Design a protein with these regions (language model features):
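Short, conserved active-site entrance elements at the starts or edges of catalytic domains
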Residues: 169, 175-201, 238
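Short glycine-/aliphatic-rich beta-strand segments at the starts of folded cytosolic domains
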Residues: 22-41, 116-124, 227-237
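N-terminal amphipathic/hydrophobic targeting modules at extreme N-termini
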Residues: 2-6
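Acidic, proline/glycine-enriched N-terminal capping motif
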Residues: 7-69, 75-81
Length: 312
């Protein structure tokens, strides 16, 4: 990847814009004549819709339909070096490379873990442009803002060019949690959660009309039957933040597990039918002794506990 990619988004108002380097994110590059076709046969998203300017949220699944790793797929234009770049959890990048190489067979692709060279900067509450890296809008939900794939030592320069204040990664976590966006390894367990449980179907991470991908049969069946009983959902609390991993209880009955928590908001993997029963019976939900309340996010289209059908 060139040091300064000439790729930007439409400039806009940047008052109050913040940016944070995300140390938990890594980068895997897939390049070659067959790169798009190769990944499109594996990942949940339609990579035919990825362009230098439009990234896609996706995941690699087990044959049983569970998430091995989720990622944001961005593209570099041919004049800037070409290739598809996967913005993924850094701890899982080596495993992702290993898995992709397993499926490579005779495909004309080169797969590289570039996490030692490249990192990911998130920028939100504004828009801007920078030539210090590959800029793409976060495709998961409005409000998440931009992401910039770049050498980490250029983060301060990229933030300045964006017109953003460079802040700690913890500030981005507060923003992510406030928007109700799940984070793998904290809000759901990799290799144990289905895409629906991690809200990938709600956040543009699964294209049900594309061709085959690994685990498609299970995921499509869950979609058509509406059989996802568990989901990561936003919650609110007024007291001290509940600890991640504590059970969420409705009386003596466990209804889920607590995940992220920051600044009065959190995320929890909840069994929706049991939550609906608790709400109907006016039984409070408790996470480690802390009362929590489910809060419906703007992006949710699935039937919310207590509602009769999904939002139109």
């Amino acid at each position: 990847m060139p040091q300064r990619l000439r790729f930007s988004v439409i400039s806009g108002k940047t008052i109050g814009m913040k940016a944070a380097l995300l140390p938990d994110r890594g980068v895997v590059k897939v390049a070659g004549d067959d790169a798009r076709k190769f990944l499109n046969g594996l990942l949940t998203a339609d990579l035919g819709r990825v362009t230098p300017g439009s990234a896609r949220f996706a995941a690699l699944l087990t044959p049983q339909g569970k998430i091995i790793v989720d990622c944001i797929v961005a593209e570099v234009a041919p004049e800037d070096g070409a290739g598809l770049f996967l913005d993924c959890p850094r701890a899982l990048a080596p495993n992702l490379v290993e898995r992709l190489n397993f499926y490579k067979l005779r495909a004309k692709v080169v797969i590289e873990d570039l996490s030692e060279m490249l990192g990911v900067l998130a920028a939100w509450d504004g828009q801007g442009s920078t030539d210090y890296g590959l800029v793409y809008e976060d495709p998961r939900a409005a409000g998440l803002g931009l992401r910039v794939m770049l050498p980490p030592h250029l983060a301060d320069k990229a933030a300045a060019e964006l017109g953003a204040e460079l802040v700690e990664a913890s500030a981005y976590e507060v923003h992510r949690v406030a928007l109700g966006i799940p984070r793998g390894g904290l809000d759901f367990v990799y290799s144990d959660a289905f895409p629906h449980e991690a809200d990938m179907d709600q956040l543009g991470g699964v294209d049900f009309d594309k061709g085959c991908f690994i685990g498609q049969e299970v995921v499509s069946r869950m979609e058509h039957r509406g059989s996802a009983r568990n989901r990561v959902v936003p919650v609110a609390y007024d007291a001290f933040a509940p600890e991640a991993g504590v059970p969420v209880m409705a009386g003596e009955r466990q209804v889920g597990t607590m995940g992220s928590a920051a600044a009065g908001r959190g995320l929890a993997m909840l069994r929706l039918d049991r939550v609906a029963d608790a709400l109907a019976a006016d039984v409070a939900l408790m996470a480690g002794g802390v009362p929590i309340r489910p809060v419906k996010p703007g992006w949710a289209r699935f039937p919310w506990p207590g509602e009769t059908k999904a939002a139109e």
